[in-house]
Structures are given as structure tokens and as C-alpha cells.
Amino acid sequence: EKIVVPYNNLGIGRLIYQLPIPLCQMFMKEVFGEKLPDTFDDETLTTINKFFENNLNVSETSRQLYVHRNTLVYRLEKLQKSTGLDIRVFDDALTFKIAMMVVSYMKYMEQND
């Protein structure tokens, strides 16, 4: 099953989806080194996605994940140690989100080659 998204609704994806794959790979190595976002465990990915859905709001994210606020902070700090990015800080969150979109784009391109 494929999802069709109108071009006007892609947002920043319109820029990402025009990047050449070698440039995407270079960006990913700069941001993550060898630890790509698709190598994170399910709990970490769920935490990251929910945190972004809640606009970087720690309290709301912990409530929706049914975890204590300190547990969420611990997970975010663990992510920071492994990636060097503190997604509670807007600039790092933006870099991380773009990197996740680049990973999705690269996977899509691999499947369609």
C-alpha cells in the first residue's frame, strides 16, 4: 500500500527529495557518524516521534507515553550521549528531524531503484 502526498503538502520534504543521494549520505555521516536513526531501538524511535508530535514538550510527551517525566528526560539524555544532539534544543531538534526525513528519503530511493 502506497501513500500519495500532494506536492504542496510536502513542506521541507520538497527540498529534501531533490537532494542527490551522495549529498544525503554525507549529511548523515556528519550528523550521526555510524549510528543512523534506523539503528535505534523501537522505544527510542517511539520516544523521538512522540516528542516531535508534541512540539518538544516534555510534560505532554511523558503523559502520552505513560512514563514519568524523569524517565523521558533520561531517554532524551541517552539519545544525546549517543548522537551528540540534544533534541530538547530547537536547533538540534531541527537537525535531527531533517536527518530522519533524509533517512526516509534514502530508503525510498533504495526500494525504487
Write out the residue ranges for each language-model feature.
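Cytosolic nucleotide-utilizing catalytic cores of signal-transduction proteins
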Residues: 1-113
